Amino acid sequence: MATVHILTQYVWPDAAPTGLYAEQLAARLEQDGRDVRLVGGRGGYRELQRKRPVARITHLNHYRGSRGNLRQSFTEYASVTRAFCDYIGRFVRHDDVVVVTSAPPNTVTLAQAIRRRGARSIYWLQDYYPELVRGLYEYPVPLRAVFRRFWDHHLGRWDRIVKIGSNLGGPTRNAVVIRNWPTMSFDRPTAPEPRTALYSGNLGYGHDIELLVHACGKLRTAGYRVTMRSDGRGAWQLPAWLQPMPLENDPAKLRDDLLRHEVHLVAANPKITQAIFPSKIWNTFAARRKLVCTGFAGPMIEELEISKLAPFDRHLEQWTDLIATAQNSGQPNRVERIEPALA
């Protein structure tokens, strides 16, 4: 039986958002009877207590930097990517399928290593880095164009790119949109506490903190109690009245926290509309809570409106269908033109 290898920087027991989605895809494939390996590093992003998701999990050795230190982070990115390349050379076989997430970003260069093994390659584009880096430094337009050409050249080498939103940049020739889904179930949503609002998650390079603080201020003036649970560089920039609390590391408590609040806040950056699409909106939709978005502009607003109508209970099924098609393909390196939308 051909193996599906899913590679991402952080995997269980860590709970980075990209890693959570990777493990939930791996669990679904394992339930369907496929041979699956979930492969990641040994670094840490965020703790979340939960059971082992699949039988076969491989943690690779690599340099581990300090989160928040850019130099050390980039060194870790390079080290993780080298570890992935070594894994591909040692364990990937002809007709296998290799799914690689955009964490770390250097993995965009791995398509050729997968191709040399005669396997199918799928790149899971959660973040489009030529635009995301603008949240760190608004670099000159000519340099931005060079970076986009470099990135798009490497994206074009993959058999498939799966974008989590239609607003993400990158080529369309080999791309398809399969949106994310709720990472937890809300079988019986309860009534929230009135006049409560919650931001829960990372505040990083893709978020405009000033716009988020302004929205929180308006809610506060309207009588809402605003709870801020966040980490990341943006959390350091919050005013005293919005000082963040620790993120919940117990899934049951996180679910209760989401259900307890009437309004969920989601932040973006209007300057970088092709970089990301916040995955936390899917838990908000599933919990049937009100959504307040800040920093959404242009294609992000269009994607938000599509997402409100998207059948998120089918998105994992779309993934399994895509992988089944890749496994059944007699020509692993052939790319057919497809439209960049499934939902």
Region annotations inferred by a language model:
Residues 1-51, 160, 214-223:
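N-terminal subdomain of nucleotide-sugar transferases
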Residues 42, 164-167, 178-181:
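Carbohydrate-associated surface elements
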Residues 79-84, 89, 97-117, 123-126, ...:
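An aromatic- and histidine-rich active-site surface loop
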Residues 106-109, 113-116, 129, 141-161:
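Membrane-proximal helix-turn-helix segments that form the acceptor-binding/catalytic region
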Residues 176-195, 208, 330:
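Acidic anion/phosphate-binding donor-loop and adjacent secondary structure
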Residues 189-207, 213-216, 227:
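Conserved donor-binding/catalytic core segment of Leloir-type glycosyltransferases
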Residues 207, 250-256, 264-285, 292-303:
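Nucleotide-sugar-dependent
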Residues 230-258:
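Nucleotide-activated donor-binding/catalytic signature segment of Leloir-type glycosyltransferases, i.e.
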